[in-house]
């Protein structure tokens, strides 16, 4: 932390435990974009809240008000850019557009786009966090935690794969599920496989005195796409921004801002203001 270790004490829980990686591998610009003074103070003062119906409900409500709502569960087979237009192939049919804004993971864009050499080069630099969650119930009559808890000792690369936080979503709601969160990857270490990571999280819960009944949900995420410090310093973002509009293609989504809702939405609004 450049000789300022107290910053790590303030930032490590909302950054590393929230799945954004370790401070020795993630460029500081990402940390500062997310944990600006206002956001950091929310965590310090415990001024936090959640959406009662989950964040997906926000997008569902927005989508219901759109003139052209999102088309869900559509498989895009390929995208070509020819004759000043963009051709999108869906279920064997071609739809042609004036331009396209890509918000899906850019590192996979070459899999279905007629990607240029520059797109392939830049987007191959992207990595992401393997951030896993399980939701478990506790055996009746056994110990039940009163509140969510961080395990700060597990937020270091040396404890990769161990549970960093367990979470109780609702206040005064006995016997609700408990969610566990782990990271399985670090730039300088071997990737921990999914099943091993899950087992480590549950062993940590047992160490905390929790007697697991069953797992009711589990998920591994494509989480927080980013580039590492060498590519960041070499101007990765400047190079991608310089491509905006080429072949009627624009790039947005998490990688162009940060892996949370606010920064992603702000970038999207800025992109539209600049080019449309």
Which functions belong to the PLM regions below?
Residues 78, 107-108:
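Glycine-rich nucleotide phosphate-binding loop and flanking beta-alpha elements
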Residues 90, 103-104:
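Short, well-ordered coil/turn residues at beta-beta hairpins
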Residues 254:
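Active-site glycine-centered loops adjacent to acidic/histidine catalytic or metal-binding residues
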Residues 77-95:
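Conserved beta-strand-loop-beta-strand element in the redox core of flavoprotein oxidoreductases
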Residues 70-72, 102, 251:
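A structural signal for the hydrophobic beta-strands that form the central parallel beta-sheet
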Residues 264-276:
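Internal hydrophobic alpha-helix adjacent to the cofactor/substrate pocket in enzyme cavities
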Residues 97-99, 108-238, 248, 258-262, ...:
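C-terminal segments that line or cap access tunnels to active or ligand-binding sites in enzymes
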Residues 1-80:
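Active-site/ligand-binding neighborhood in enzyme catalytic cores
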